[in-house]
C-alpha cells in the first residue's frame, strides 16, 4: 500500500529558517536547497549530488518539529510522521521563462500538482526539483518551496495564499487517489483557468457550477463528497489574495512549453516512437490469430 504523506513532509517547511536574501542579491541561477534534519550523512550527500548543488547555494535544515508546526492544520500527526528526510531545491530562472517542476522518488504528488499549487502561491519563473533518498509521498514539499522562492526573490507571499496553496496540494493528492492523478491535476487547473480568464465567481453557487462544468468537460465523475471538497477549496481561493493575472500567465506559459515540445523535432520523434510502440503491440496481437 502506498505510503501517503510520509517522508516529504520535511520539504513543506524545509526553508523556514533560510536567512533573508534581498532582491538585489537574487539572480538568475541562484539556488536554495532544503535538507531534512534526519537524513543520514550518506543520504544527505546522495541528494546533494543528485541535485548537483553548486558551492554557493544556500542550504538549510528543517526538523520534524517544524514539519508538525506548519502541516498539523491539514493532516494528522501520524501522517506527518517522526522524521524529516525530504529535500528540494528552487533555482531562479530568467523573467518570463515560467515554471518547471521535476521530481524523483515522489509517489503521491505529480509534477503537475506541484505546478498548480506553486502557481496559486504566486511562484513564477523558477526551476523546481523535489526529491528524497527513497520513495515518499511528497505532500510536504510545497511550503518549503514557497519559502525558498519568497526569500530568494524578496517577494512576500501572504499567509492566506500559502495556506490555500498547501490545501490545494493536499486536496489534489487525495482526489488523485480516487479519480487518477492526471484527472485531478487537470480538473484543478481547468477550474483555476476559469477563475483567471473569466473572473472569480461571486458566490458558492457559481463555484459549484464551475466545478460541475469543468468535471463534465473533462469527462470526470465526482462524488458529492469530492465535489464539496473542491467547492470548499475554491471558495477559500475566492477569498484569498491570489494574483489571478499571474496564474493565467503561468498557465499560458505551461501550455506554450507543451505545444513547443510537440511541434519540435524531439517531440515529433517522441510521439512517433509511442505510435510505433503501440502499432508493434497491435501487430503482435494480430499475428497470434493468423
Swiss-Prot record:
Subcellular location: Cell membrane; Membrane raft
Organism domain of life: Bacteria
GO cellular component: membrane raft; plasma membrane
Keywords from the named record: Cell membrane, Membrane
Protein name: Uncharacterized protein YpuA
The keyword Cell inner membrane is assigned to this record: no
Induction and repression of expression: Transcribed under partial control of SigM ECF sigma factor.
Organism: Bacillus subtilis (strain 168)
Amino acid at each position: 500500500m502506498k505510503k501517503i504523506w510520509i517522508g516529504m513532509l520535511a520539504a513543506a517547511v524545509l526553508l523556514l529558517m533560510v536567512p533573508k536574501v534581498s532582491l538585489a542579491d537574487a539572480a538568475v541561477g541562484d539556488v536554495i536547497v532544503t535538507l531534512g534534519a534526519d537524513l543520514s550523512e550518506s543520504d544527505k550527500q546522495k541528494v546533494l549530488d543528485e541535485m548537483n548543488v553548486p558551492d554557493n547555494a544556500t542550504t538549510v535544515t528543517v526538523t520534524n518539529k517544524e514539519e508538525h508546526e506548519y502541516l498539523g492544520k491539514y493532516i494528522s500527526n501520524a501522517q506527518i510522521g517522526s522524521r524529516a528526510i525530504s529535500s528540494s531545491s528552487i533555482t531562479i530562472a530568467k523573467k518570463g521563462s515560467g515554471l518547471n517542476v521535476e521530481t524523483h522518488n515522489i509517489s503521491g504528488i505529480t509534477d503537475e500538482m506541484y505546478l498548480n499549487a506553486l502557481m496559486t502561491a504566486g511562484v513564477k519563473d523558477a526551476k523546481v526539483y523535489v526529491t528524497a533518498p527513497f520513495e515518499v509521498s511528497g505532500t510536504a514539499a510545497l511550503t518549503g518551496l514557497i519559502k525558498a522562492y519568497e526569500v530568494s526573490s524578496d517577494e512576500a507571499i501572504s499567509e492566506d495564499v500559502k495556506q490555500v496553496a498547501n490545501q490545494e496540494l493536499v486536496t489534489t493528492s487525495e482526489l488523485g487517489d480516487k479519480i487518477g492523478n492526471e484527472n485531478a491535476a487537470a480538473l484543478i487547473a481547468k477550474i483555476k483557468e476559469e477563475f483567471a480568464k473569466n473572473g472569480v465567481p461571486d458566490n458558492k453557487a457559481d463555484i459549484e457550477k464551475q466545478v460541475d462544468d469543468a468535471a463534465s468537460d473533462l469527462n470526470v465523475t465526482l462524488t458529492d463528497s469530492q465535489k464539496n471538497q473542491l467547492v470548499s477549496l475554491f471558495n477559500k481561493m475566492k477569498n484569498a489574495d491570489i494574483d489571478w493575472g499571474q496564474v493565467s500567465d503561468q498557465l499560458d506559459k505551461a501550455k506554450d512549453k507543451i505545444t513547443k515540445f510537440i511541434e519540435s523535432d524531439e517531440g515529433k520523434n517522441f510521439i512517433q516512437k509511442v505510435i510505433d510502440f503501440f502499432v508493434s503491440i497491435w501487430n503482435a496481437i494480430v499475428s497470434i490469430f493468423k
